[in-house]
Amino acid sequence: MPTSTSATVRIALFGHVSATPAALTKALGDQGISIEATGDDLAHVDCAIFAVNPSAGIDAETITAWESFNDYLTPRIMVVLALPGAELDFDDAVSLANRVFDQMATPYLVLHSDDGSPAALISLDDLTIRNYLHGVAVISESEPEHKELVADFAEEYRELVESSGEDAFSAGLLFPAIPVNLENGIGIDVLVSYLRKLK
């Protein structure tokens, strides 16, 4: 049963309409996570989520919103939505965000099925695989070829986390990029786990 985050945690969501922020808000609401309208009250936002459609890029308004939180050291997460028919993917969005937002941390990478659709996530922390069945993550050990495929990315991620320090996300110093597919639930649990770290 989903539990609610504390009433004192204020979470805001930003993103171009092409990134379907309304659908993401609903998916989070289904998990007991409330998204609040912020207006100009940025100082009291505890976390900002930035929804990105890889095919549409990141618009100037979203970049400005990201930058507006720099002075507050507000925790920020980029959610990259897998949308039907999208030509670009998670890796493309992260590359762009590294240029226009900040250095992004990628705790998970997407594993694709034979038809090219997102099928699972692999953790760069412990190299486990999260397969999603009806929106529920089933965690298993990765195969040796998966470990080899992501070895360099995992090392880079661990170095970034180590250099950022403990609780760097909550301190607004480490910016996770999370792949999400609303159709099959990929990544929603990962996003929720980050949001629940906030106090």
Put a short name on every predicted segment.
Residues 29-43:
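A short, well-structured beta->alpha microelement
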Residues 2-28, 45-47, 54-199:
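P-loop NTPase catalytic nucleotide-binding module
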